[in-house]
Every structure is written in structure tokens, then in C-alpha cells.
């Protein structure tokens, strides 16, 4: 085999013949080869749940398949993209190219092939960060330098950094693009001092066109590494080279960060990414399902999106978990199956938190209204009145603001929510039939 990607693709073709189609689509199709070191093949799984399942159910089969292909007994190790980003990849040496010096190039596979601008789902929480990243990719060091992206875990910071790298390389194959974590920068710096190779280290990172450095907050408290990165930053900035930095917090909130570094991080543009709203979460799930060739009912994606609102990584992991559970018990995917599949990761110990989705579903069950009709523009009484009841209950049973409730009902104005609440409140004082129906809905929600 010419390289590990070819080897793994050949292995996948063989594995596809040995397992059921749902199992292959769920567990194996989305894996990629990471590296091959000392007879250990490292495979990247899309998330922690898939990694754990592959380790416990497919390691032996994969090892046997690779033995048939290579005649070598390879150990198998699984990782997830987050840990992949922090490890150095050893690839078979590429063929020499006289027109291009690869000595300062990061191997192409260090940039996750799935993290591009095309695969990034844009929503209200990341729209500005996406626009800034695209501007930087289109004109390195001419738009915002540095670009500082911050936000919580699993919200897409690393995705945008990889997307910048891919875009730059695609439009300028000779560009020297380096992506690494601040932890890897620290470790390499320490090793360079130990091995008396400080000059080589500086040349490596001060002679690039684009430096993408992830999780810069881990430089906090590391005085010598901060000193080195300060000079690296200056060298690149003075040569008009692009610097992109990510963190879990803005520069001013990183503890024990030198003021001179903090001020340099603030030279360019600082943008944040916030957790995705409901519509964005649904769009993310749809894109993930399409990319993986999965046919997922809309009600299931709506259920998952309502239950998992923390970050994209957990959201996609929940989808894979539902698909896997469906495959294992050989049943079609629906909302009830999704609830069963996710019961272990959705805590039940605390008091039940009722969501607007829960209310819409309960009202829909009682009044025979489809979930999508609550967001639609339909004004027929058979839809409009149940919608008003759902708005009333959303105001009574959730902590959501008026604009948020309106947003969940198709982007309606907050005054519409107020009107619905006042109308239903007034009717409930005299309409016994409505009282019974609302009581029935409340029983469903308990």
C-alpha cells in the first residue's frame, strides 16, 4: 500500500462485506486512518461513543482483516478528533517534489478532511466567527491579524481553524500552513531546549504563512513558553503572516497570561461562538445525517435537538447513539426509540424540565396537530387555537422569554405570545371543556 489511507480504504471495503449494512454505516464508514507507528494502527472515530463501541466490538475483526491484507499483525487503537489534534502524525514519506519544500509543511492529514467551510453549519451563535474566518482564509494577514476565536467545548472553533487551513492550501498549494495545539507547542519547545534544538524549533514556527494554534489558554502559567510564543507571534506579525488563535475564553479572562501577549491577541479581531439555537441544532443533525447517508425522521431530529443543547459534539454523538441502538435492536427509528437510546445520557434524577418542544408535542397529541404546524403560518382555527394553548403553557411552564417562545413558534412576535397568554387565561376561567383539555395536557407533561 502506498500510504495508510489506501490501506484503511482497502480494509473498509473488506469489512463492508463482513458486517451488516446498518453496522457498517453506523460504525465503520465514518472512520479514518490516523497513523501507523510500530505496528499500531490508529483509527479516528467520530465521537467517544463510537470509539468505545469500536474498541469493544470490532478490534479483533479489523485486526484480522488487516492481517489478510498485509500479512502483518497490527494492533488497533481508536481515538477521537479532539485527541487527534493534539498528537503528531507519522506518515510514510511523500514522494519528493522539487517545486515545493515540504520541510516546513504540516502533513495534509493533520487538517481534518471533514472540517471545511462547506461542512460548517452556520447559525446565529457562530455567524460572525464564520464570516471572520472566511475573510481571513480569503486574504491571510490582510483582513484580521490575529483572529482570536473563543467559546465553549465542542462549538466549532477547531472546525473553523481547520477550514481556514484547507481553504488557504486549496487556493495556494505552496502556502506553509501549520495547525497545532498550544500543548503541542509547549511540549515541542521543552524538547527543543532539552535536545539543544531551539534554533530548529524557532525556524519551524517562524517561517510559516499561516499559524493556527488551538486552545491557547493552556499557555497560562507557562512563563518560558509564553516568552517563546511572544517572539514567534512578533516574528510572524512583522512578516505579515496570518495568526489564528482559539481559546475557551477571551484574552482578558485567561489567568496568568502576560499583559504583552494579551495585548497582542487584542490587536486583531476577537469573536466568540455560543451554543447553537434549536434551529441550528436541527440543521447540524440534518447535515450530519446526510453526510453519513442516514434516513432520520424529522421528529427524531427535533427530539434530539431539544434534549441536547450543550454543544455540537454531544449533539452528533447522540444522533449516532440513536442510530446504533436502532441497528442493535433491529427497529425503525422514531421518537420513542430515541428517548430509550438516550435515557442514560439525559439525567432523570433532577426534576423534569419541561421544554417548549414537550409542550408542542403534548398539545399536538391532544388536538391532533402536527409538530411542524406550530411553526407554520396556518391560521385555521384547528391549528391557531392549539398553537395559542401551547404558547400559554410555554409561558406558564417554562422559563423562556417572550421572544424565545415566539421564536419556537415560527418566529412570531412577542406580542403574539402575550395575546395568546391573555386569551387562554381568560377562557380558562369559564370554559370547563378547555380546563379539562389543559389538565389532560399537563398530565401528559408530568
Curated annotation (Swiss-Prot):
<feature type="binding site">
    <location>
        <position position="157"/>
    </location>
    <ligand>
        <name>ATP</name>
    </ligand>
</feature>
<keyword id="KW-0235">DNA replication</keyword>
<keyword id="KW-0547">Nucleotide-binding</keyword>
<comment type="subunit">
    <text>Oligomerizes as a right-handed, spiral filament on DNA at oriC.</text>
</comment>
<dbReference type="Pfam" id="PF08299">
    <property type="entry name" value="Bac_DnaA_C"/>
</dbReference>
<dbReference type="InterPro" id="IPR013159">
    <property type="entry name" value="DnaA_C"/>
</dbReference>
<dbReference type="GO" id="GO:0006270">
    <property type="term" value="P:DNA replication initiation"/>
</dbReference>
<dbReference type="InterPro" id="IPR010921">
    <property type="entry name" value="Trp_repressor/repl_initiator"/>
</dbReference>
<protein>
    <recommendedName>
        <fullName>Chromosomal replication initiator protein DnaA</fullName>
    </recommendedName>
</protein>
<dbReference type="Pfam" id="PF00308">
    <property type="entry name" value="Bac_DnaA"/>
</dbReference>
<dbReference type="GO" id="GO:0008289">
    <property type="term" value="F:lipid binding"/>
</dbReference>
<dbReference type="GO" id="GO:0016887">
    <property type="term" value="F:ATP hydrolysis activity"/>
</dbReference>
<keyword id="KW-0446">Lipid-binding</keyword>
<feature type="binding site">
    <location>
        <position position="154"/>
    </location>
    <ligand>
        <name>ATP</name>
    </ligand>
</feature>
<dbReference type="InterPro" id="IPR027417">
    <property type="entry name" value="P-loop_NTPase"/>
</dbReference>
<dbReference type="InterPro" id="IPR018312">
    <property type="entry name" value="Chromosome_initiator_DnaA_CS"/>
</dbReference>
<dbReference type="Pfam" id="PF11638">
    <property type="entry name" value="DnaA_N"/>
</dbReference>
<feature type="binding site">
    <location>
        <position position="156"/>
    </location>
    <ligand>
        <name>ATP</name>
    </ligand>
</feature>
<dbReference type="GO" id="GO:0005524">
    <property type="term" value="F:ATP binding"/>
</dbReference>
<dbReference type="GO" id="GO:0005886">
    <property type="term" value="C:plasma membrane"/>
</dbReference>
<keyword id="KW-0238">DNA-binding</keyword>
<dbReference type="InterPro" id="IPR024633">
    <property type="entry name" value="DnaA_N_dom"/>
</dbReference>
<feature type="region of interest" description="Domain III, AAA+ region">
    <location>
        <begin position="110"/>
        <end position="326"/>
    </location>
</feature>
<keyword id="KW-0067">ATP-binding</keyword>
<comment type="function">
    <text>Plays an essential role in the initiation and regulation of chromosomal replication. ATP-DnaA binds to the origin of replication (oriC) to initiate formation of the DNA replication initiation complex once per cell cycle. Binds the DnaA box (a 9 base pair repeat at the origin) and separates the double-stranded (ds)DNA. Forms a right-handed helical filament on oriC DNA; dsDNA binds to the exterior of the filament while single-stranded (ss)DNA is stabiized in the filament's interior.</text>
</comment>
<keyword id="KW-0963">Cytoplasm</keyword>
<dbReference type="InterPro" id="IPR020591">
    <property type="entry name" value="Chromosome_initiator_DnaA-like"/>
</dbReference>
<dbReference type="GO" id="GO:0006275">
    <property type="term" value="P:regulation of DNA replication"/>
</dbReference>
<feature type="region of interest" description="Domain IV, binds dsDNA">
    <location>
        <begin position="327"/>
        <end position="446"/>
    </location>
</feature>
<feature type="region of interest" description="Domain I, interacts with DnaA modulators">
    <location>
        <begin position="1"/>
        <end position="92"/>
    </location>
</feature>
<dbReference type="InterPro" id="IPR038454">
    <property type="entry name" value="DnaA_N_sf"/>
</dbReference>
<feature type="region of interest" description="Domain II">
    <location>
        <begin position="93"/>
        <end position="109"/>
    </location>
</feature>
<dbReference type="InterPro" id="IPR001957">
    <property type="entry name" value="Chromosome_initiator_DnaA"/>
</dbReference>
<comment type="similarity">
    <text>Belongs to the DnaA family.</text>
</comment>
<dbReference type="InterPro" id="IPR003593">
    <property type="entry name" value="AAA+_ATPase"/>
</dbReference>
<feature type="binding site">
    <location>
        <position position="158"/>
    </location>
    <ligand>
        <name>ATP</name>
    </ligand>
</feature>
<dbReference type="GO" id="GO:0005737">
    <property type="term" value="C:cytoplasm"/>
</dbReference>
<dbReference type="GO" id="GO:0003688">
    <property type="term" value="F:DNA replication origin binding"/>
</dbReference>
<dbReference type="InterPro" id="IPR013317">
    <property type="entry name" value="DnaA_dom"/>
</dbReference>
Amino acid at each position: 500500500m502506498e500510504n495508510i489511507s489506501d490501506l484503511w480504504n482497502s480494509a473498509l471495503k473488506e469489512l463492508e462485506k463482513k458486517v451488516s449494512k446498518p453496522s457498517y454505516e453506523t460504525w465503520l464508514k465514518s472512520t479514518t486512518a490516523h497513523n501507523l507507528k510500530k505496528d499500531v494502527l490508529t483509527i479516528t472515530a467520530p465521537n467517544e461513543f463510537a470509539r468505545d463501541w469500536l474498541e469493544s466490538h470490532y478490534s479483533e475483526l479489523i485486526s484480522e482483516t488487516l492481517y489478510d491484507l498485509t500479512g502483518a499483525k497490527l494492533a488497533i487503537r481508536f481515538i477521537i478528533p479532539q485527541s487527534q489534534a493534539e498528537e503528531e502524525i507519522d506518515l510514510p514519506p511523500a514522494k519528493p517534489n522539487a517545486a515545493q519544500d515540504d520541510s516546513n509543511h504540516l502533513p495534509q492529514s493533520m487538517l481534518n478532511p471533514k472540517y471545511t467551510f462547506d461542512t460548517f453549519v452556520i447559525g446565529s451563535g457562530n455567524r460572525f466567527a464564520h464570516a471572520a474566518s472566511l475573510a481571513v482564509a480569503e486574504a491571510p494577514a490582510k483582513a484580521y491579524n490575529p483572529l482570536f476565536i473563543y467559546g465553549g467545548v465542542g462549538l466549532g472553533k477547531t472546525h473553523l481553524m481547520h477550514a481556514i487551513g484547507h481553504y488557504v492550501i486549496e487556493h495556494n498549494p505552496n502556502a506553509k500552513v501549520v495547525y497545532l495545539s498550544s500543548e503541542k507547542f509547549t511540549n515541542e519547545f521543552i524538547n527543543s531546549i532539552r535536545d539543544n534544538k531551539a534554533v530548529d524549533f524557532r525556524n519551524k514556527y517562524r517561517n510559516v504563512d499561516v499559524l493556527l494554534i488551538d486552545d491557547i489558554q493552556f499557555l497560562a502559567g507557562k512563563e518560558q513558553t509564553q516568552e517563546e510564543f511572544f517572539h514567534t507571534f512578533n516574528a510572524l506579525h512583522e512578516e505579515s503572516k496570518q495568526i489564528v488563535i482559539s481559546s475557551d475564553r477571551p484574552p482578558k479572562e485567561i489567568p496568568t497570561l502576560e499583559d504583552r501577549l494579551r495585548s497582542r491577541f487584542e490587536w486583531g479581531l476577537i469573536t466568540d461562538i455560543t451554543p447553537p439555537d434549536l434551529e441550528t441544532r436541527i440543521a447540524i443533525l440534518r447535515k450530519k445525517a446526510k453526510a453519513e447517508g442516514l434516513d432520520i425522521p424529522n421528529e427524531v431530529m427535533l427530539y434530539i435537538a431539544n434534549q441536547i443543547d450543550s454543544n455540537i459534539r454531544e449533539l452528533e454523538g447522540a444522533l449516532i447513539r440513536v442510530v446504533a441502538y436502532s441497528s442493535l435492536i433491529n427497529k425503525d427509528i422514531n421518537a420513542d426509540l430515541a428517548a430509550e437510546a438516550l435515557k442514560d445520557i439525559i439525567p432523570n434524577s433532577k426534576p423534569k424540565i419541561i421544554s417548549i418542544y414537550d409542550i408542542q408535542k403534548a398539545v399536538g397529541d391532544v388536538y391532533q396537530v402536527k409538530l411542524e404546524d406550530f411553526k407554520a403560518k396556518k391560521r385555521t382555527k384547528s391549528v391557531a387555537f392549539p398553537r395559542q394553548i401551547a404558547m400559554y403553557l410555554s409561558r406558564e411552564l417554562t422559563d423562556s422569554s417572550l421572544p424565545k417562545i415566539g421564536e419556537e413558534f415560527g418566529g412570531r412576535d412577542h406580542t403574539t405570545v402575550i395575546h395568546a397568554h391573555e386569551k387562554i387565561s381568560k377562557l380558562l376561567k369559564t370554559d370547563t371543556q378547555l380546563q379539562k383539555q389543559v389538565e389532560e395536557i399537563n398530565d401528559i407533561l408530568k
